Each structure stands twice: as structure tokens, then as C-alpha cells.
């Protein structure tokens, strides 16, 4: 059986993800809420969803696919979500006025059109997740900064962590991964202390916060954030946390554009919306390149990366999400976007319009909350 690369904690997580529909159709399977489903093309051209034990009934299922899409079972809901996402993807033959075979290549204009279409779709998905966050806050009457930030932090994949002997071995590897002469390591909870004031070895060995709090990874050749800066969030299965931390340290040694990194303690991996972050000087294109280099350095198999995009961030690939900083706004991604939502909640009218106005006023792209405004 081939490994499953597309995993989602619930139908809602699938609905609000930036999943690649074509990739799922090619792979032919996905996992939702711990259950595996087969993906097939129905006779009417729609996407059909099957449980593995239904393979013998495939022909009959395909004939009734349209009926099943409207059902209420988890399988039917998955089919509905996938078909809605497929319908939202611009059809290249309609957009370009002719059919185009990607394997045979084409003009640079066609390639640019494809990239532009993908970019617009991703922006819409990013904005949709941002609007959902704001509307949920408004419905719950949560207008305070802390409550809004809690909603964002709670948007997590909630991976189950290993236990017993495996957990202890992983923790030992995790500690070994954060020892490098070119980097300084310090718990975020002690940002107010100088490096020489903290006994890191003792903290890791004795303080219970070491297993759940964030560790900063800062190059000793201090690298200040520039005007064009952002963050790349990396999501992996908890058992690969130490392997990822080591790759992050190696990437920082090789690329001066990475100003620092941050990893959460192993007991908290997958329990919040982001568990590993790289802060970079550059733009979206730079983040994409660094993300791919990090994947290669890590040696983590494709199935080790999780499909999860934090609210108001832009997916740049499986397990990778990106968002930019704006000068004068909070450096924390969650806090910065929380302030935008707080502004929008004070206004009147459609939430979409309120959010776009609030984003523009704070220097963000009104069409994509992950990016800063371009002049």
C-alpha cells in the first residue's frame, strides 16, 4: 500500500486547506479524521470518494456519485469539498482559449498565465481562512486581542504524539539536535535574560517548560530583519521534530537570509498551529526556494510533512506556509493579524469589505492577508 501524503484532522480542516486537488487525484487516496479514503473519477467527471472496502462496488458507486455528493456522511462531505475545490480551480483550456499539454511545454506567456491563476487561487484561499477566523470571533463575541489570538493558535492539526520509550528517545535526539557552535539557543520564555545568565543544559533537563515551550535558534553573527521580511512555518509529524530542527540549523549556517528560527518542545509538537518557524529576509519566491532546500537537507520523507496551513498564511507546498511582516506592526504573525481583525470588528457592513479596508490601513495586501501591500 502506498503511503498517504494528504492527511486532515477533519472535513473542516480539508475544507479550509490549500490542498492540491490534482495531486490528490493523482495519488488516489487521502486520510480524514484517521480514516483512509480512495479517490476516483466518477462517470460524470466529478470526484468520487470510496472507503477501501468499497472497491468491489466501484462501478455501481460511480453511477450514483451525484447522489452521494449531497449526502451527510463524512465520505459524502469529503466528496462535496473536493468537488467544490476542483470547480474553483481555473480551467486552463478555457482561460487560454485552447488545450495545453504541460508535458510538451508551451510559451512563456502560457507559463505565466498558469502561475498567475495559481497565485489568484491561493490568495483567495488565504483570504477565506482569514475571513473565517474573523467571522468566528464575531459570532462568539470575542473582540479582545487574547481571545482572537487563542482562536488562531487553536487552529491546529493536533497530531498524536508518541508515548513511553519512543517519546524518551525522541526527546534525547531533540536535545542533541540543538547543539551547534554557530548558533545560540535560548527558551523564548526567557527572552529577557542574557545567554550567559541561563544554564541551558539544566533548563532542558529540569524545567518542565522545556518540553512544551519554544526555543529560539539565533545565528551568532547577528542578522537583523530587513524591510522585506517574513516567516516560513514548517509542519512535520512529531517524530521528525528533531530531524527538522537539525536541518533548520544547517540551513541557517548556509543561508544568511535566514535571521533566526524557532522550534517548540517535543511534547507540544502538532498541538498548536505552528511548531517550527524560520524568519527570513526576502519575499515569497525566496521563501519557496528556502523551503525546498530545507526539505532536501532534512531527509524527511514526503509523508512526514503534514498538510496544514495556519490561518491567514499562504501555503507554499506540503507542510510549508508563508507570511510577511509589515514595518511598524507586531512581529508576531498571530498578533499582527489579530489587530487587523480587531479593527474590522469595530466596523459595519460585510466582513469581507471590513477586512480588506483594515488590511490596507495596516499595510497588508487587501486581497491576501499573508502578504504586505505592494506600492
UniProtKB/Swiss-Prot annotation:
One of its GO terms (biological process) is symbiont-mediated perturbation of host programmed cell death. Keywords: Hypersensitive response elicitation. Gene3D superfamilies: 6.10.20.120. Pfam families: HopA1. Coiled coil: none annotated. Unknown. May serve a regulatory function. This is Protein HrmA. The gene is hrmA.
